[in-house]
């Protein structure tokens, strides 16, 4: 508790230069699952040596280990970033004593923020789940979906429809969520006039971008930002490029690069919005690196890279963090992933 108080005081100090009457900032948190520097570089070299991340105002490095393991998984790292505590691999939204902890999304919601989550995995996958769910096993997808149904998140977009309407317990959560409207396409999502919308994009896991996944992440994010902005309230938006990680596990560079390119295009759209809005803090990082990827050859002229992997699992290497917008200087430096929560909380409670 004392550590938390000291950290909040330290993080609040740069905020004193802003007026006490200044409007609460929007926060867009973007996570490239499995996205290390080599994944970013592979996407960049495959895109005429350019990445939208070059537009970031501040850059740092993040330590990713879990409570008892040097190599984290997405559940533990997601919980660290979302709630500021270390926990065991596989555990979502609970500390090392299995005590539920409040996430930054839940704190922002309780402060009057609009909230939204978008993922290119199922919406009940470990990283998005860590922002609204409390379970001992990341694989308890039915329970995670049940907790999402009671979370009061305004907008959620991702795969995994079967965990809502084709469940072992025979419940149909979509019918139970009578205060939500459910979209069946991006066009339908855009048309619906409601402050609570679910868009379950695939019955199970979404396919990869290289396999033709639609709608695109950038289109889903732009549509969601437009909805959030229309309520004239601050908002918290979590965006996960989930399948950079999946390609890394398969040592499949086509999958990795196609996901990286889509994530990078989405970063560009988010930066465009933030630069125009002038009251949106954007934070972009990864939960961990996947595959131990190295770029060993290639050709800039042809935008080609030759990659090698040392693993089909996660690694313990630090991952980068990028930021833009008001208070983005807070995210400079080298620090633990739990401090991302501390810094975001300091912005919200200022």
Which residues does each PLM region occupy?
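Functional beta-strand-loop-alpha-helix junction segments that form "active/interaction loops"
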Residues: 95, 183-221
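Short amphipathic alpha-helices and their capping/turn segments at secondary-structure boundaries
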Residues: 105-109, 187-191, 221-231
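Metal-dependent active-site segment of extracytoplasmic phospho-/sulfohydrolases and closely related
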Residues: 37, 259-300
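Gly-rich Lys/Arg/Thr-decorated short loops/hinges at beta-loop-alpha junctions or inter-strand turns
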Residues: 84-88, 198-209, 245-250, 322-324
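Structural motif
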Residues: 29, 199-201, 236-240, 283
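Bacterial Sec-dependent N-terminal signal peptides
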Residues: 1-21
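Active-site His/acidic residue clusters
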Residues: 126-132, 204-212, 221-225, 229-234, ...
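N-terminal catalytic scaffold of extracellular/periplasmic and nuclease hydrolases
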Residues: 20-167, 172-189, 289-350
């Amino acid at each position: 508790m004392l550590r938390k108080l000291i950290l909040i005081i330290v993080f609040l100090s740069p905020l004193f230069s802003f007026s006490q009457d200044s409007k609460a900032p929007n926060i867009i948190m973007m996570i490239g699952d499995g996205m290390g520097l080599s994944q970013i570089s592979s996407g960049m070299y495959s895109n005429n040596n350019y990445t939208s991340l070059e537009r970031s105002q501040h850059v740092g490095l993040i330590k990713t280990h879990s409570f008892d393991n040097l190599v984290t998984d997405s559940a533990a790292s997601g919980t660290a970033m979302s709630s500021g505590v270390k926990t065991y691999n596989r555990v979502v939204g609970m500390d090392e004593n299995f005590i539920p902890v409040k996430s930054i999304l839940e704190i922002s919601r309780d402060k009057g923020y609009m909230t939204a989550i978008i993922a290119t995995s199922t919406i009940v996958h470990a990283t998005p789940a860590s922002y609204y769910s409390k379970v001992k096993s990341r694989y308890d997808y039915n329970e995670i979906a049940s907790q999402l149904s009671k979370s009061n998140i305004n907008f959620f977009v991702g795969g995994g429809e079967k965990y809502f309407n084709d469940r072992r317990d025979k419940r149909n959560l979509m019918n139970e969520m009578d205060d939500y409207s459910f979209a069946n396409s991006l066009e339908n999502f855009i048309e619906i006039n409601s402050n609570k919308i679910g868009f379950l994009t695939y019955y199970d896991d979404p396919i990869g971008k290289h396999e033709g996944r639609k709608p695109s992440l950038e289109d889903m994010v732009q549509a969601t930002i437009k909805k959030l902005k229309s309520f004239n309230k601050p908002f918290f938006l979590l965006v996960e490029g989930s399948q950079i990680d999946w390609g890394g596990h398969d040592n499949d560079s086509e999958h990795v690069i196609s996901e990286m390119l889509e994530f990078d295009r989405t970063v560009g759209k988010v930066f465009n919005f933030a630069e125009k809005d002038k009251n949106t803090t954007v934070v972009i990082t990864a939960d961990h690196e996947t595959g131990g990827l190295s770029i060993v050859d290639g050709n800039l002229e042809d935008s080609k890279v030759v990659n090698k992997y040392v693993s089909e699992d996660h690694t313990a290497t630090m991952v980068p963090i990028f930021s833009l917008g008001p208070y983005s200087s807070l995210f400079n430096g080298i620090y633990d992933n739990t401090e991302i929560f501390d810094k975001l909380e300091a912005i919200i409670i200022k």
